[in-house]
């Protein structure tokens, strides 16, 4: 695993030890950022099922100024922190060990908005529609923002969730990727 582009291009990322996480492949990550970017002039991101932190770190490398990383797995949190330290990105990040729904509630209380939200839950525990509903209800997505929902290709996600509209859907092997933006 590596950073594909931007200020940290080519740098290696550690993967989470064991089989509890499924990192986004470099090919899928590159495709995702070609769909949403590829580069950014500032903005805040939320990597909600961070794993090794690959998606949020890629966003930072490509111009996001800050990213919040959330995962409930202790080994994943340690790996994110290690990758951020190695890449000298710790001052641009906050890392929390938390459940996804609790993390969304906490961010909503702080009235935190995001330019980019990355949702890549374990394929066996996908509650993407419920998470998209919370993001919409809490109005967490900025006007020009996007949500990347990575999922098992067999999962059918809704075209709309409240004011969120799926603008693109792609499949890469066993992985599906859906991009949502605000209606408007």
Curated annotation (Swiss-Prot):
Assigned EC number: 2.1.1.-
BP GO terms, sorted: rRNA methylation
GO molecular function: methyltransferase activity
CDD domains, alphabetized: AdoMet_MTases
SUPFAM superfamilies: S-adenosyl-L-methionine-dependent methyltransferases (SSF53335)
UniProt key word rRNA processing: yes
Residue segments, region Disordered: 1-22
Keyword S-adenosyl-L-methionine included in the entry's annotation: yes
Entry keyword set: Methyltransferase, rRNA processing, S-adenosyl-L-methionine, Transferase
Protein purpose: May catalyze the S-adenosyl-L-methionine-dependent methylation of a specific base in rRNA.
Family the entry assigns: Belongs to the methyltransferase superfamily. RsmD family.
Protein name: Putative rRNA methyltransferase YlbH
Organism: Bacillus subtilis (strain 168)
Organism classification: Bacteria, Bacillati, Bacillota, Bacilli, Bacillales
Gene name per UniProt: ylbH
